[in-house]
Amino acid sequence: IESEGVETEIINVGSRVLKGEVDEVVKEAGDKVKTADGVIVGSPVYYASASGEIMMFLDRFFGAFGADMKYKPGSAVASARRGGTTSTIDDLNKYFQINQMPVVSSNYWNIVHGNTPEEVVRDEEGMQTMRLLGKNMAWLVKSIDAAKKQGVELPCGEDKIKTNFIR
């Protein structure tokens, strides 16, 4: 993403959630997202799904700051030794979709395989997928910025209709 001229910042939440700092990291991320143009959320795969730490963080984060995320591009990435990556991406993408965020993709599912960082960089297909994801994210962020500068208005919203299945 940075090679495309877009500034990035990494917030590592997993270890902080385990230390009981979930409220602090949610507030920190919420403060930063006000000026961010997009987000990429990543998770290792544990038991064929996203880590509990990232899910706890996202539940709290989007509960507090979901409205601030509207129309900001989002993408999910997953890393695993073997299986569970697509279900992890599905879990993470739901936060973007329910908050009206464009979901950025690549030329394959946004996954890498490896048990260590050294193994992951040897996953040539996965690394290509990540490079293309970065280019696509940078392109969409720049495109949205250009549209704003040209006066293109955001879509008109609607009040949320909620349906209970039991009446």
Per-region residue spans from a language model:
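N-terminal beta1-alpha1-beta2 submodule of the flavodoxin-like/Rossmannoid cofactor-binding fold
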Residues: 1-66, 121-167
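Short, glycine-/small-residue-rich phosphate/pyrophosphate-handling segment
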Residues: 69-113, 117-131
